[in-house]
Amino acid sequence: MDQAIGNKIADYLIKPLNPNQLLLSIKKNVHMNVIITETTTVGYQQEFSRIGMQINDSFTTDDWMEVYKKLVYWELELENNQATVSDMLQMQKKEANNAFGKFIKKNYMNWIQSPDKRPLMSPDLFKKRVFPILEKGEKLFFILIDNFRLDQWREVKDLLAEYFTFDESLYYSILPTATQYARNSIFSGLMPSQIEKMFPDLWVDEESEEGKNLNEAPLIRTQIERFRKKWTFSYNKVHDSQYGEKLLTTIPSLMQYQLNVIVLNFVDMLSHARTENKMIRELAQSEAAYRSLTRSCHLQIRLQSSEYFVRVMCHSKKIYVLFWN
């Protein structure tokens, strides 16, 4: 039996053989894709009206998070499905986007003016998610994957399941969501206008040709100091595979720090290449193809770094991975 399973058998039958077992095995291996497609299609058609009602009845930030997660779930379930059902989903996503835009327009200024009453947002991540873990004396890797969507995370999650357990939650980005604003807000714990006022030497204006995210490490330091902590930290930004391979070899030395911040830009670079590079554009013509390409990139990273993941887990109880879009 072990040898058969090791050779990736499709199924097995045990004597005495029941005719229904034989029929089930044949259907499973010959018609499985058709059955799954039909079942998924019927499932979404039944859910369509409920999701529409949920969109209309979404009045809180938690409501909208649930809508988003449900739409992402069905997008992944239907990615290989017939065009008619996929068109229904795209129409529903557009409806949700329009309604969500109105929700943000109505509430955003209140969130800015009343930080204690708003949902978890970019400036709050370190204060509410990172610092409490450091307060317990645990070492922490904070990995920020730029321009990484929830549907892409769902596509690659199983690649990391061997090494991590997951505690997932969503947060709301500030506006604009552009890197120079939202990512600086995460690392500083401040709104962009506050960064400009409190640390003018670390803020780069929109019109400037200088890189807008060159001061992320100093911004992290200012946030730690503002909370009167003395935690040690490292900061690394991975732009290419060569730097990534070099970083992996330094994992043991990073264990001396209480906080290690790693920014991964490859998904963002892939996103830009999707519009600027003809070959990448052809490889990722659809959202499903784009997710598949993202998975391939993550798989390559996983193969290169499996040994170092084990080393990290031996020294750190928790690793937070922030998916930022």
Locations of the language-model features?
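Active-site His/acidic residue clusters
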Residues: 257, 261-292
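Alpha4 helix (beta4-alpha4-beta5 surface) of REC/receiver domains from two-component response regulators
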Residues: 1-11, 24
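C-terminal output helix
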Residues: 17-26
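Beta-strand elements within well-structured catalytic alpha/beta cores of enzymes
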Residues: 137-156, 186, 259-264, 293-319, ...
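Active-site nucleophile/metal-coordination loop of metallo-enzymes that catalyze phosphate/sulfate
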Residues: 46-51, 113-136, 150-239
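Low-complexity, highly charged intrinsically disordered N-terminal segments
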Residues: 59-109
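The C-terminal output helix
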Residues: 27-40
